[in-house]
């Protein structure tokens, strides 16, 4: 499989996953022009569009893409029904597109009906899990978002996190503020600074790395808890996550 990140807007990524026959799926096309350019350049044949949630920077290109490809199915949660989705899916569904299987995972938090698509090893998680961070809570609760990212954290180490935004450096800056002595975070920050200086994407990233450098996946860390002022037992970490997310919002 060939995974392509298509830059859009200021910091979005639209994902394109293609097989050897050049058949591809398009994930979260916030605008159509860069997608059409990538399809033309690579001579790819789109088989489906996958939507993770209803925000315009993820769905804005659907209508125009459907004008170019009238028969293309557009999968998405119910909240995307009026944003161009033609087939509604929900957590627990399984899709087969061009010989590639996708597991639909419900990940409420950023929005109430947000979903992710997992096709081993690729995880298209929209605005739920970012490299070194997680999405803002526009509709859901901290408990929902924490449960969602914990669910994603159970996937295999080799899972490739395909987030929808290039937020990694900003997230690592916050992570360094929370855990200034953490060597894994410090080292990774330097690596990503070098990548971004060359205008190269920081994504996808292996889940194995995220477990080390993403503070939202480390709510059980006692140093982190002391830093944010919320000490909590391992079986009750939502309060830690909630305060951590609030501090990131203010950072």
UniProtKB/Swiss-Prot annotation:
Zn(2+) 2 binds at residues 57-58, 127, 165. It comes from Yersinia enterocolitica serotype O:8 / biotype 1B (strain NCTC 13174 / 8081). Thiolesterase that catalyzes the hydrolysis of S-D-lactoyl-glutathione to form glutathione and D-lactic acid. It is an enzyme of class 3 (hydrolase). GO terms for biological process: methylglyoxal catabolic process to D-lactate via S-lactoyl-glutathione. Zn(2+) 1 binds at residues 53, 55, 110, 127. Monomer. This is Hydroxyacylglutathione hydrolase. The keyword Hydrolase applies. It catalyses: an S-(2-hydroxyacyl)glutathione + H2O = a 2-hydroxy carboxylate + glutathione + H(+).
């Amino acid at each position: 499989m060939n995974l392509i990140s298509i830059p859009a807007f200021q910091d979005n990524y639209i994902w394109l996953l293609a097989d050897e026959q050049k058949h591809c799926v398009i994930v979260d096309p916030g605008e159509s022009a860069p997608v059409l350019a990538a399809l033309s350049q690579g001579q790819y044949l789109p088989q489906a569009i996958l939507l993770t949630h209803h925000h315009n920077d993820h769905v804005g290109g659907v209508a125009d893409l459907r004008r170019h490809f009238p028969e293309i199915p557009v999968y998405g949660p119910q909240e995307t029904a009026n944003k161009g989705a033609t087939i509604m899916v929900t957590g627990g569904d399984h899709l087969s597109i061009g010989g590639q299987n996708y597991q639909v995972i419900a990940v409420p938090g950023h929005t109430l009906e947000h979903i992710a698509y997992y096709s081993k090893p690729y995880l298209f998680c929209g605005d739920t899990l970012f490299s070194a961070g997680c999405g803002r809570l526009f509709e859901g609760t901290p408990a929902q978002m924490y449960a969602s990212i914990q669910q994603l954290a159970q996937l295999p180490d080799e899972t490739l996190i395909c987030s929808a935004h290039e937020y990694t450096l900003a997230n690592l800056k916050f992570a360094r503020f929370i855990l200034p002595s953490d060597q894994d975070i410090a080292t990774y920050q330097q690596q990503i600074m070098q990548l971004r200086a060359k205008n190269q994407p920081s994504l996808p990233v292996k889940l194995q790395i995220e477990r080390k450098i993403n503070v939202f996946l480390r709510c059980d860390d006692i140093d982190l808890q002391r830093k944010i002022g919320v000490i909590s037992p391992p079986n009750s970490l939502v309060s830690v996550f909630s305060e951590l997310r609030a501090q990131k919002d203010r950072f």
